[in-house]
Amino acid sequence: MADLGAEDKLKQICDALRIETLKPAEDEAEAIVRNAKEQAKRIIDEAQERASQIITSAQQDADHKLKQGESALAQAGKRSLESLKQAVENKVFKESLAEWLDNALADPEVSAKLVAALIQAIEDQGISGDLTACIGKHVATRAVNEFLGKSVLAKLKGKGVAVGNFVGGVQLKVEDKNWVLDLSSDTLLDLLMRYLQKDFREMIFQGS
């Protein structure tokens, strides 16, 4: 905006002197002011355009970084959730299953049934040879032998079961072929985990 005080003074001088030679100077001054205003407007417009570009670029950069942050946060959340699921599975599912399995395999009758089932399985496959049955170290061999009965014991080397170096379950060794059929507690736990893990996850983590 032009300085009104300066314009008033200029008008007063022109009126007082009444000299026509000042008219061209006045016109020149108006042209200079007009040109200055136009240049100022261009500068302001260019500055506003540049500022708009900077803001847009900054906003796009911020949006990109925000999306990257959101993506990283989502990935971190997924990893944390998966870690939590693994922790719950190990603590709640695996430990509970292991405890139940240990209790079940502590029963001499269960060990006897597992031994009998393994012997029957190899006989069905036409396999024969010296057999050694080992049971968990916390299970009484005498009780297992009683549950097996004479007909099954007669098929075993030593006419009875031996104590293995595992907690529970059984192992049947086919000595001639150097085979070991393993239904020890650790093996059974792994089998049950694989078969039941999906159902457990769907039941506990449904919707997560």
UniProtKB/Swiss-Prot annotation:
- Gene3D superfamilies xrefs: 1.20.5.2950
What is an annotated GO biological process for this record, any one? proton motive force-driven plasma membrane ATP synthesis
The record ties this protein, via Pfam families, to: HrpE
Keywords associated with the record: ATP synthesis, Hydrogen ion transport, Ion transport, Transport
One GO cellular component term of this record is: proton-transporting two-sector ATPase complex, catalytic domain
Q: One GO molecular function term?
A: ATP binding
Write down the InterPro entries for this protein, in alphabetical order: ATPase_V1_Esu, T3SS_HrpE/ATPase_suE
Q: What does this protein do?
A: Produces ATP from ADP in the presence of a proton gradient across the membrane.
The record's comment on protein family reads: Belongs to the V-ATPase E subunit family.
Q: List the protein's name.
A: V-type ATP synthase subunit E
- Taxonomic source organism: Chlamydia caviae (strain ATCC VR-813 / DSM 19441 / 03DC25 / GPIC) (Chlamydophila caviae)
The lineage, from the top, is:
Bacteria, Pseudomonadati, Chlamydiota, Chlamydiia, Chlamydiales
